[in-house]
Amino acid sequence: MIVSLRCCLLLVALLITVETAIMSKRDIVCSVSGDVACNLECELLHKKKGSCDENGACTCFNKKRETE
């Protein structure tokens, strides 16, 4: 009983860790590699341009982005 409870808790902790890593993946891209990696990821996955915003998150946008 105790062993199965430990396994269950370990599995839940692992799932939470993996989910957190997936949810924050874009933030990791910007903090580690910057705009170049963000732009490459957006180009490959979404056929769009990308850049890191002021919050450090990778943001994808259409290639014909207007600059102000």
From Swiss-Prot:
Cellular location(s): Secreted
Disulfide bonds: C30-C52, C38-C58, C42-C60
GO cellular component, one term: extracellular region
GO biological process: defense response to bacterium
Tissue-wise expression: Expressed by the venom gland.
Keywords: Antibiotic, Antimicrobial, Defensin, Disulfide bond, Secreted, Signal
Signal sequence bounds: 1-20
Keyword Secreted: yes
Domain of life of the organism encoding this protein: Eukaryota
Function recorded in the entry: Antibacterial peptide mostly active against Gram-positive bacteria.
Similarity annotation: Belongs to the invertebrate defensin family.
Other information: This toxin has also been classified in the scoloptoxin-02 family.
Name the record gives this protein: U-scoloptoxin(02)-Er1a
Source species taxonomy: Eukaryota, Metazoa, Ecdysozoa, Arthropoda, Myriapoda
